[in-house]
Amino acid sequence: MDAREEKPAGGIGPAAGIPAVVSGSGNGIARNAIVDMLDTLRADHLGCYGNDWIETPAMDALAGESILFTRAYPESLPTMPGRRSLHTGLRTWPFRVWTPNRGDLALPGWQHIPEEQVTVHEAMAGAGLHTVFITDTYHFFKPSQNFHRGFRQWRWVRGHESDPYGSISQVRAEDVDELLPEGLSQEEVFWMWLLLTQHLANQGERESEEDYQAPRVFREAMRLLEENQGVERFFLMVDSFDPHEPWDPPEKYVEKYDPGYEGRELIQPHYGPSDYLSAAELRHMRALYAGEVTMVDRWLGLFLERARELGMLEDTLLIVTSDHGHQLGEHGLIGKLSSGLWYELMDVPLLVRRPDGVGAGTRVEAFAQLHDIPATVMKALGVEPPAPQDGMDLLELAAGGVAPREHVSAGYANNSWCRDERYVYFAGNDGTGPHLYEMEADPLQEHDLAAEERGVVEEMHEKLLADAGGPLPV
């Protein structure tokens, strides 16, 4: 039997529909909640996390009003496995119960939410809140997915990446070719050619910054706020696929970070070793990503400004985070490769703003993960979880009311990752290809100790096995 079949899907709850009304009297610290998910946002690309060359004034200002978690990590990677833990508060890793769906990515954990698992939005709806969802993350709406379950109002902003929205018959092959790197074979770039063809078909009619994906998402989110001013209580989830690639922000953002570049506009990375890029091309690709980050920051800021104007932040818990980062050549890789679980992929921002201002401007070093967010939201809004949660209340963690974790674990495809107070470790699920770093002495994870510290490697792998409840699937 495949190890992936050994363990039933986690969670307890009704098999269908929104759960019965549970405690939702508002006895928590907030009446409403907004969760902003910004896909592929590296923590180290924000000023509030120490970056000194990328402009992120909105998130930096928000950090001054929020509790900032300095050691926040995904529970599962990439997009949809991470969303499952975010939407349910239950662990998705180690991906034991998984069947690939036709027409979707064949990655462990990339699947719909099991019927027996209750989402945070179902719990909120069952407690009488108006639940609202806005996103351009097109994976949510593939035929096999069901993540909009429990939202009473939702909107899909079309056109990001490979969303089959625009007609590819309108795209010229030579326009696609100009976006492809030189020196790679046709077989190597074929998937990029398909993706970029659809991208150009989707984005061909942009005329101003407002027509780009993140601006469209946040403009629509503003309209949703305006439409729902009269509701008694609400839960809003804004899921922006930006700053996910392709990276082609308006030119003014690119000029901030790489003025005068004259080479090819390589807006889509080829996943794998980064040495196919020249030094100038790699620098420019990093500038493209930085430009996307600054654009997303601007529109998040405009959205929050509108929420303030409408008085809809006054009694609202606000959380901003990301699902994972992106490799940009730091360890010789570019993309989101599951074999490279270094800081550039694993460190994510996590800002939690209480409406009463408690903890504003503080930094919390306790480990936090994305599946902590549902427990945090439900506790803050006085909604009883419909089932036991795997995550913990981040506000209680920040206040010292609960013991911090001694370590955290996560997984991506057939690789798993663990961090404790001293070390970070990752390897294949079968223990092959181990990497080990001592974080205080080596925060950039440049000096691999796995070969010389075999005892520590074994200890860290045992922590993974304990968290997984047994052998890891291979």
Model-derived features: positions:
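Catalytic domains that recognize anionic headgroups
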Residues: M1-V474
